[in-house]
Amino acid sequence: EWGILMYEGLLAVLALGTVALFREDVKRAFPFHRPTIAKTVGTVLMWIGTLLITMIPTSILLYVFPEQMSGATESVSELSGGLPFGIAFLLICVTPAIFEEMAFRGGLFSCFRGFRSPWLAILISAVVFGAFHGSFWRFVPTAMLGIAMGYLLAETDNMFYNMLFHLINNALPTLLLQLTSSVASEQMESAEAMASTGILLVTVAVYFIYASAGPFLLYAGNYLIHKG
């Protein structure tokens, strides 16, 4: 547990070092302002919309490469296994939301703020963010989440919202694991066996249907983060 905390803390130190190296203004690199209700709701809607859209590459990869995808999703379960919920929430949800956002949407993002289009900073930070998680199979959906968080920062100039997005995204699997921790081991083994053998094509189609709601939620969220 301490190793994870120190590792995440090192990211924050590197972010601060990067800002100092490039002589960036700390307040500009890590902008924080009082959040508004509209922007907060918009952030939640954008997270839901992004999550639904990431179902498309995730379901395709799960259908084509079931064993690899099953292995890629075990890290959170292994990390939180046996830990009290409070500690698991701190390690998996809170510290990454703060320290990883400082590193990728803070230090790294600020290096490219001088360019005319913010999309260079958004895309580069998202690609590095996806690669940072060390799994080829998780790269695309993770990078897509990184794009959404970078966009939030670029449009709101407030790290509160991309940190909130990151926190919610990590909290969902953590909460689900806690809720299912009481399931009998036989049932868990059966579920893992089903995951390792893949999903039906009809399930992929269902995911695509869910994902179709994503653009509407992104539009609504985008409206609110600009309205608020």
Predicted features along the sequence, with ranges:
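Membrane-interface helix caps and helix-loop-helix hairpins in membrane proteins
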Residues: 131-137
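Hydrophobic core of alpha-helical transmembrane segments in multi-pass integral membrane proteins
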Residues: 11-19, 47-55, 201-226
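Hydrophobic residues within alpha-helical transmembrane segments
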Residues: 6, 45-46, 95, 124-128, ...
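Hydrophobic alpha-helical transmembrane segments
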Residues: 5, 40-45, 86, 90, ...
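Functionally important transmembrane alpha-helices
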Residues: 126, 138-196
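Juxtamembrane helix-loop-helix connectors linking adjacent transmembrane helices
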Residues: 1-2, 27-98, 114, 187, ...
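Alpha-helical transmembrane segments in multi-pass membrane proteins
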Residues: 1-23
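Membrane-interface helix/loop boundary segments of multi-pass membrane proteins
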Residues: 99-124, 151-158
